Amino acid sequence: MYKIGLNRALMIANKMFEKLIYDISLSEGNSMTLLETASTLSGKVPKNTRVKDVVLLANLKNGYDYIFEKIKENNFYFDKETFCTENRLVASNDNFDNLGGFRQHNIRIVGAKHTGVAVPNLEKSFFEISNKYYDDKRVGIKIVDLFLDLCKNKYFGKGNTRTAQLMMCGLLVSEGYAPFSINFKDAEYSEALINFYDDENKRDIILKKLLNEQKEVTKSFLNKDELKIFKEKEI
C-alpha cells in the first residue's frame, strides 16, 4: 500500500467526506442520490426525503466526526472503548441490543449460514483480533484485514458493517493512507462478503478486492511523478 502521510490523508478524507458517507449509507438502504446525500449532510434536507435516511446520515456523520476529531487530537486507536462508542453513535436508532457495548443475543445474517461469534465468546474474540491486529506486520493491509474480522464476528446487534467501515477509514488515515468506502448492496461485494462469512478460505478474495479499491482511490489523488513511483513499486 502507498503511504501519503497523515496531513494529506486527512485532506483526502475531507474531500471525500460526502462520498464516504454515501457509500456506507447505501449499504444500509439509503434511497438518496449522492447529491441529495451531500445536501442533507450540509443541513439542507431535500423534499420528500425519508426520515430514516436523514437519521442514518446524521448518525454516520456523528460517527465520522468522532473518529476524525480523535485523529486530529492524535488520540485515535483501535480499542474496545473507541469501537463501542463508534457503534453507539452510528447505530443509535436501530441497535437495541446493549447499545454502547457488545451484543447480548445471538444474531442471524441474511443470506449466510454464519451467525457471528457466540455471545459468551465475544470478549475473548475481541481480545484475539486486537492482538492479531497489533502483531500483524503487514503495514496498511492489516487495517483492511481487521475490517473483515470486525464484520464477520458481529460484535453488535446492529450497525456492524458501518461501524467497521468508519473504523477502517479512521485507521487508514491515522496511519497516512487514503480512506475508501464500499457499498455492500453492490452484488459483487455482497456476494464476496457472504462467501467470506461462510468460508474463511475466501478471505483473500474479498481482501484483494478491497485493497484494489483503496489503491484506485490513492491513485486518483497522486500527481504524475507520484504515479510513476507508484507504478514502479507495483512492478
Language-model region placement:
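FIC/Doc superfamily catalytic core
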Residues: M1-I235
